[in-house]
A protein has these predicted regions:
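Acidic, Ser/Pro/Thr-rich low-complexity regulatory regions
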Residues: 1-69
């Protein structure tokens, strides 16, 4: 089973690569909202590939989501 820490590490790496790609081709960087959606899409893909469970998706908060409590 894969942990949230491992998934977050991979997502951070992917976002760094994407940031460098965008800088090199001269397009705007991802917004904070883009990163929220990226996390959701990435974890959904892991679930579809049966790498993580629905329970993990339900328990894991999105580290890129803003919360004003």
């Amino acid at each position: 089973s894969i942990t949230k820490r491992e998934v977050l590490s991979q997502v951070k790496y992917n976002l760094k690569v994407e940031s460098m790609r965008r800088k090199n081709i001269g397009i705007k960087q991802m917004s904070k909202l883009d990163k929220v959606f990226y996390w959701s899409d990435f974890t959904e893909a892991l679930y579809r590939d049966q790498i993580i469970t629905q329970s993990q998706i339900d328990r894991w908060s999105n580290p890129y989501e803003f919360r004003n409590y």
